[in-house]
Curated annotation (Swiss-Prot):
Swiss-Prot/TrEMBL cofactor(s): Zn(2+)
GO biological process: methionyl-tRNA aminoacylation
GO molecular function: ATP binding; metal ion binding; methionine-tRNA ligase activity; tRNA binding
Name of the protein described by the UniProt record: Methionine--tRNA ligase
Organism from which the protein derives: Methanobrevibacter smithii (strain ATCC 35061 / DSM 861 / OCM 144 / PS)
Pfam families: Anticodon_3, tRNA-synt_1g, tRNA_bind
Keywords, comma-separated and alphabetical: Aminoacyl-tRNA synthetase, ATP-binding, Cytoplasm, Ligase, Metal-binding, Nucleotide-binding, Protein biosynthesis, RNA-binding, tRNA-binding, Zinc
Similarity annotation: Belongs to the class-I aminoacyl-tRNA synthetase family. MetG type 1 subfamily.
Length: 660
């Protein structure tokens, strides 16, 4: 028997759960945990709400509430959502609990006393209007890597971890003004010292899936810089140093430790050591947007502390909605609470698993959800079960009939049934959850065909033993389905077992124990029903209605042609170009725009050497408010494409000519 530590990525306590949360993280973790419990492994499945950081502080400011009130509100919603989806957590706690504070501060001190954390003078964005330094998410701007809108700590588009000072066109989230750069200090972790260790971990850990390994390798190629561990703000875990008044631990540092504090709380309540689980097998289930943090930062911290590194990091990919990216701000999302109010949660568990491999991006479509429910659950699995149970009662008084003198077809079908638990178990063990469910569906289809071919409704009049063998084997498959479906759709699996008159199907090995001849089953009830078109149409209409209401509220984001005319774009020619000290992305340019020469700071250093830009014609926004980037005045903006940062090339235009 193995002990297995399984964690779900901590949901951030600034909103309830939607389909994407369940699909990428909590559902696969639950499937894996349930299966391993069924094969008698000792599983500890933990999670917590992540309750510090700037988004909660920002929301609290807007609502004139305390951050802890915001966190508590959404913690309660998240617990409701997770429980409604039957996620079988052993412990679910909060990063605002006293035990978490104790563990996080002790972890910091351990690394600090080892000399792996140091104080460093840095430059940081400061809002002169708000009179405060701006931690990561108090800043929004443009990602210097891919050109998308990004927060001060992370770009959702390309997955890059960022520092606020790296953003192009930074803005204070509170007041909208352009911040300045000021000198301050923070505490840094010597992540660079563990670069070789992390390369070895990524290269030689055969358990890591390809998407995690490839992401991590790409980042490691660029080399690792030391990682800032602290922020200037009130909401967070205070640094346990007298000299660090006003500093708190960066939320990403202490959020990782939520896995440990949740397990430690469980240990205090049960008297069982959580460390035994971690030191045997430790597996993280996360979303792909936080691969960088879990494959680089977290293993680096653990290595520094002296802990065993995670055995596996399973990252679920993104889920879109009706072909479009989910957006909570636009209300283009299906909330878990809304779904379970109208549908059985097992239907969602089935659909999100069978729709696509979890390491591939996929889409949730109401029409496809209806199709899979009706064609697969109702017409195949449900139909097979209902016919089996109904005919058993009709022809054999609800008792498992005698099995003898099997035909070749009987023997073949019996062999398929007996192999099913092993095949599904191997798929789940290998994190191939969809393939396991597809195999169950495939065998259920075979069961329907076998039932049709044997025609027990005719055989009872012509060859009673043929009918008996058919119903015997069909009931054996029904029993097997109760077991192999338990990790996927636990409520329905229990319902199947109840009809068969069995206890809860909790031991995987019992899937192979045949029902005894003469065993009495209960009367059948329909387990899966079809979803009508009008029900689905109502959901689609509701989704569009929510989007329209959100768009109406955000019409202020659109600009008129008159507003656009205010933007003055001219053709400029680069006369001088040089790198900005301490920045690997920024260049300082002197650009002739016809009537004057402007100094412009541009994020082009990774794409162009300074000498390549001399005499190059470029498109320049010339009426932007001047701003300082890395302490250097910028009096305009060079237009370039997003991810490649390729310059627009108006070579045939005259310097100073305005683009209309």
């Amino acid at each position: 028997m193995s002990k297995i530590f399984i964690s779900c990525a901590l949901p951030y306590a600034n909103g309830p759960c939607h389909l994407g949360h369940i699909r990428s993280t909590y559902l696969p973790a639950d499937i894996y945990a349930r299966y391993n419990r069924m094969i008698d492994n000792d599983v500890l499945l933990v999670c917590a709400t992540d309750e510090h950081g700037t988004p909660i502080a920002v929301k609290a400011d807007k609502e004139n509430k305390k951050p802890i009130e915001i966190a508590k509100r959404y913690h309660d919603m998240i617990v409701r959502d997770v429980e409604s989806m039957n996620i079988s957590l052993d412990n679910f706690t909060r990063t605002t609990d006293d035990l978490h504070y104790e563990i996080a501060q002790n972890f910091f001190l351990e690394l600090y006393n080892k000399g792996l954390i140091y104080k460093k003078d840095i430059q940081q964005l400061y809002c002169e209007k708000c009179n405060k330094f701006l931690p990561d998410r108090y800043v929004e701007g443009i990602c210097p890597v891919c050109g998308s809108e990004a927060r001060g700590d992370h770009c959702e588009k390309c997955g890059r971890a960022l520092e606020p000072t790296e953003l192009d066109e930074p803005k204070c989230l509170t007041c909208g003004s352009t911040p300045v750069i000021k000198d301050t200090y923070q505490y840094f972790f010597k992540l660079s010292e563990f670069e070789d260790d992390l390369k070895d971990y990524i290269d030689n850990n055969e358990n890591l899936p390809a998407n995690v390994r490839n992401y991590a390798k790409n980042w490691l190629k660029e080399g690792l810089n030391d990682w800032v561990l602290t922020r200037d703000m009130d909401w967070g875990i205070p640094l346990p140093l007298d000299e660090a008044k006003g500093k708190v631990l960066y939320v990403w540092v202490e959020a990782f430790l939520g896995y440990i504090s949740s397990a430690a709380q469980w240990s205090r309540e049960t008297g069982i050591k959580w460390e035994d689980y971690w030191n045997d097998t430790a597996i993280h289930f996360i979303g792909k947007d936080i691969i960088y943090h879990h494959s680089i930062f977290w293993p680096g911290l653990l290595k520094a502390y002296g802990c065993k590194l995670p055995d596996n990091i399973y990252a679920g990919e993104f889920l879109s909605l009706e072909g479009e990216k989910m957006s909570t701000s636009k209300n283009w999302v299906v909330w878990i609470a809304d779904f379970v109010d109208k549908f059985d949660p097992d239907l969602l568990r089935y659909y999100l698993t069978i729709n696509a491999p979890l390491n591939k991006d996929t889409d949730f479509s109401w029409d496809d959800f209806q199709r899979r429910n009706n064609d697969e659950l109702a017409d195949v699995i449900g139909n097979f079960l209902h016919r089996t149970f109904t005919f058993t009662h009709k022809f054999f008084d609800g008792e498992i009939p005698e099995y003898k003198n099997p035909s070749a077809e009987d023997n073949k079908f019996k062999e398929i049934i007996e192999k099913l638990p092993d095949t599904v178990g191997e798929y789940i063990s290998d994190f191939e959850f969809r393939d396991g469910l597809l195999e169950i569906y495939r065998v259920a289809k075979i069961g329907n065909k076998y039932f049709n071919d044997q025609e027990p409704w005719k055989a009872v009049k012509e060859d009673m033993q043929k009918a008996a063998n058919c119903l015997y084997l069909s009931n054996q498959l029904a029993k097997t389905l109760a077991y192999v479906l338990k990790p996927y759709i636990p409520n329905k699996a229990d319902a199947i077992a109840k009809i068969i008159n069995l206890t809860t199907p909790d031991e995987w090995k019992d899937a192979k124990v045949p029902l005894a001849e003469g065993h009495k089953i209960n009367k059948a009830k329909p387990l899966f029903t079809k979803i009508e078109d009008d029900v689905i149409n109502k959901q689609k209409e509701e989704l569009q209605k929510n989007l329209k209401e959100s768009e109406d509220e955000n019409m202020s984001d659109l600009i008129s042609i008159d507003d656009f005319d205010k933007v003055v774009i001219k053709i400029g020619q680069v006369k001088e170009a040089e790198k900005i000290e301490k920045s690997d992305k920024l260049l300082k340019l002197q650009v002739d725009i016809g009537d004057e020469t402007r100094q412009i700071v541009a994020g082009l250093a990774k794409q162009y050497a300074p000498e390549e830009l001399i005499d190059r014609k470029v498109a320049v926004v010339v009426n932007l408010q001047p701003a300082k980037l890395f302490g250097t005045l910028s009096e305009g903006m060079i237009l370039a494409t997003g991810e490649s940062a390729a310059l627009l090339s108006p070579d045939e235009c005259e310097v100073g000519e305005r683009i209309q």
